[in-house]
Amino acid sequence: MKYDSPTILMCPPDYYGIEYEINPWMSRSQQSNLEVARQQWESLYALLQKLDARIELMTPVKGLPDLVFTANAGLIWHNRVFLSLFRHQARQGETPVDQQWFEQAGFETIEMPEEFFFEGAGDALFCGDTLFAGYLIRSDVKALQWVAAEMKCRVIPLQLVDEFYYHLDTCFCPLSETEAIYYPPAFDSYGQQALQEHIPHLIPVVDEEAQRFACNAVVIGKSVALNTGCPQLEQTLRERGYEPHSTPLDEFIKAGGSA
């Protein structure tokens, strides 16, 4: 399946909630307000449509509250999808649902070897032709190397060292082939050096805005959709020729996610 325009897979938050605790943001004692979450999801949906993205929808499933975080479903490469093998049992039920959706949409799905944990585009992001791969907290480095070998592309492994930034897409966001947003303390010293060596223009995010999930953004051309409360990043993006579009996503931060 090949799309002619930027296409984003989303899942309505019908069954979203904090049903378990698998990252430091999640607390069953601090539940998400489902009504507000739906309003925030609908605002993001409308914003992405306004930015000329094509939206594909996945049907929500009761008992799979994190299905809303569709970037974790797998890594798309042309007509193929490398399906996630989630580290936590609480999320492993998502994979058959994801697989069914992708196959019905015309993709070839590829399952991970059983011994490799891999969490999709949550931990694997392209900047240019290079695959940047976050590992240790959720995905295994061997899994990321296996995926890169299957795709025959260069991979740069990046060790994540802060449990609050457990996926690569919570602390790193490519903007173009030569630019990216990142939160330096989320990486070990080698990872920081590797990013600096391979990406000419890096935009660091300050602590307060990293905690607002500034890096967990959606980039469509020169437009960047992100959570509210990131004024420094928004200013820097404008200076670099991008147009930031903020929309509140606080209810999803309660589960460790954003846009």
Predicted regions and their residues:
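The feature marks the mature, well-folded catalytic cores of soluble enzymes
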Residues: M1-A259
